[in-house]
């Protein structure tokens, strides 16, 4: 009998690293997309926290009137924000080494670009990581497809809109009150409430919430008891069990009698596909709407569009909305320009009809 001894093959450091990166046995899956995601999101998060606490004033309008938005300059959690990059920079790539000094980089709002660009790369890598993990586990790729909707929305707001407007100063400030300010200014300049793509987004968000609540309540109400009536239905499910944990026939029958028969799904796969499809499609359409409004393809304007037989204007809510838009636009960037473009281009109205004479 002959025994053969072979030298044991030892994996190189790179091979062991690759095996660890792509292993699905880790507590948290890393993956090759994770190699890109982790440093970019850590960078964006770290700079955001530091800037939110201690960033110096930023000259957002490029007119030497810096705005104070960090906590150390008297703001709180509500009013604090990372101020967008200065209008003097426009849409130029503005890393630290492009500025003459660190103080100049901070004064021109360089941290905003750093955070936004790293965040954008990070969430794209997170979406790729979702696909990668699904691929390793033999799952279908629809989780990453669903996450593409918020990625598209963030891309539209933080990347496409500033490019279309010609400056990162038009981007959304990274803070609570800054977000609301961005929404008001967006409405004033683009009339987004009258844009059909925004209406689809509203239907997606509220409709998705309604559908999720309906589905969750129906499932919870039709759980299957395991053995006896004395056992709680809440304890009936065991992780990994092969059989259904709720009775879809009962849920279908209940909802069909509550509304009408064809308002409910009798197929679990089509039901859950619809629950995923509805908000994803609507949010993607809204992102497309923001992307078109970035290049000033705005919402409908029905200002003074309803007249009587004599040509006199019949005021509608569209006229009220238009007046509100003008008012918001006048208040916005009040020191950067005297009047909004659509106000300055209007025919001037007489303020006084008769000259007032003063007899002293």
UniProtKB/Swiss-Prot annotation:
Keyword terms of this UniProt record: Calcium, Chlorophyll, Chloroplast, Chromophore, Electron transport, Herbicide resistance, Iron, Magnesium, Manganese, Membrane, Metal-binding, Oxidoreductase, Photosynthesis, Photosystem II, Plastid, Thylakoid, Transmembrane, Transmembrane helix, Transport
**Chief location:** plastid
Molecular-function GO terms, alphabetical = chlorophyll binding; electron transporter, transferring electrons within the cyclic electron transport pathway of photosynthesis activity; iron ion binding; oxidoreductase activity, acting on diphenols and related substances as donors, oxygen as acceptor
- Binding positions for chlorophyll a PD1 per the UniProt entry: 198
Q: What class of enzyme is it?
A: oxidoreductase
Q: Which Pfam families match?
A: Photo_RC (PF00124)
Which free-text remark accompanies the cofactor?
The D1/D2 heterodimer binds P680, chlorophylls that are the primary electron donor of PSII, and subsequent electron acceptors. It shares a non-heme iron and each subunit binds pheophytin, quinone, additional chlorophylls, carotenoids and lipids. D1 provides most of the ligands for the Mn4-Ca-O5 cluster of the oxygen-evolving complex (OEC). There is also a Cl(-1) ion associated with D1 and D2, which is required for oxygen evolution. The PSII complex binds additional chlorophylls, carotenoids and specific lipids.
Q: What else is known?
A: 2 of the reaction center chlorophylls (ChlD1 and ChlD2) are entirely coordinated by water.
Protein family: Belongs to the reaction center PufL/M/PsbA/D family.
Q: Kindly provide the name given to this protein in its UniProt entry.
A: Photosystem II protein D1
**Chain positions listed as propeptide in the UniProt record:** 345-360
Source organism = Galdieria sulphuraria
Report the subcellular localization. Answer: Plastid, Chloroplast thylakoid membrane
InterPro entries assigned = D1/D2, Photo_II_D1/D2_sf, Photo_RC_L/M, Photo_RC_L/M_CS, PSII_D1
Q: Where is this site: Tyrosine radical intermediate?
A: 161
Provide the binding site for chlorophyll a ChlzD1: 118
Q: What does this protein do?
A: Photosystem II (PSII) is a light-driven water:plastoquinone oxidoreductase that uses light energy to abstract electrons from H(2)O, generating O(2) and a proton gradient subsequently used for ATP formation. It consists of a core antenna complex that captures photons, and an electron transfer chain that converts photonic excitation into a charge separation. The D1/D2 (PsbA/PsbD) reaction center heterodimer binds P680, the primary electron donor of PSII as well as several subsequent electron acceptors.
Gene Ontology biological process terms from the UniProt entry? photosynthetic electron transport in photosystem II; response to herbicide
Membrane topology term reads:
Multi-pass membrane protein
Modification after translation is described as: Tyr-161 forms a radical intermediate that is referred to as redox-active TyrZ, YZ or Y-Z.
Q: Which GO terms describe its cellular component?
A: chloroplast thylakoid membrane; photosystem II
Q: Subunit structure, briefly?
A: PSII is composed of 1 copy each of membrane proteins PsbA, PsbB, PsbC, PsbD, PsbE, PsbF, PsbH, PsbI, PsbJ, PsbK, PsbL, PsbM, PsbT, PsbY, PsbZ, Psb30/Ycf12, at least 3 peripheral proteins of the oxygen-evolving complex and a large number of cofactors. It forms dimeric complexes.
Q: Where are the transmembrane segments?
A: 29-46, 118-133, 142-156, 197-218, 274-288
């Amino acid at each position: 009998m002959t025994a053969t001894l072979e030298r044991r093959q030892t994996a190189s450091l790179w091979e062991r690293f690759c095996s660890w990166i792509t292993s699905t046995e880790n507590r948290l899956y890393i993956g090759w997309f994770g190699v890109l995601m982790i440093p970019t999101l850590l960078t964006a998060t770290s700079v955001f926290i530091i800037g939110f606490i201690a960033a110096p004033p930023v000259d957002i309008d490029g007119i030497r009137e810096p705005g104070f938005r960090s906590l150390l300059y008297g703001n709180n959690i509500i009013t604090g924000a990372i101020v967008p990059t200065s209008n003097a920079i426009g849409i130029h790539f503005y890393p630290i080494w492009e500025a003459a000094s660190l103080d100049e980089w901070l004064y021109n709002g360089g941290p905003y670009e750093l955070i936004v660009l790293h965040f954008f790369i990070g969430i794209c890598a997170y979406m790729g990581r979702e696909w990668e993990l699904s691929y390793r586990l033999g799952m279908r790729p629809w989780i990453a497809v669903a996450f593409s909707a918020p990625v598209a929305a963030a891309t539209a707001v933080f990347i496409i809109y500033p490019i279309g407007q010609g400056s990162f100063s038009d981007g959304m400030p990274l803070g609570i009150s800054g977000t609301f300010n961005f929404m008001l200014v967006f409405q004033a300049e683009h009339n987004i409430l009258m844009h059909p793509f925004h209406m689809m987004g509203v239907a997606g968000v509220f409709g998705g919430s309604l559908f999720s609540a309906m589905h969750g309540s129906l499932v919870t109400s039709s759980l299957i008891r395991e053995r006896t009536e004395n056992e709680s239905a809440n304890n009936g499910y065991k992780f990994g069990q092969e059989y259904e944990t709720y009775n879809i026939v009962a849920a279908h029958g209940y909802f069909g009698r509550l509304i009408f028969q064809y308002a409910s799904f009798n197929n679990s796969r089509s039901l859950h596909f619809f629950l995923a499809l509805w908000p994803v499609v609507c949010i993607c359409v809204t992102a497309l709407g923001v992307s078109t409004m970035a290049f000033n393809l705005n919402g409908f304007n029905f200002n003074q569009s309803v007249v009587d037989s004599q040509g006199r204007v019949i005021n509608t809510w569209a006229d009220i909305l238009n007046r509100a838009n003008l008012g918001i636009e006048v208040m916005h960037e009040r020191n950067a320009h005297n009047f909004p473009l659509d106000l300055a281009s209007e025919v001037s109205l007489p303020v006084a009809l008769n000259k007032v004479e003063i007899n002293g």
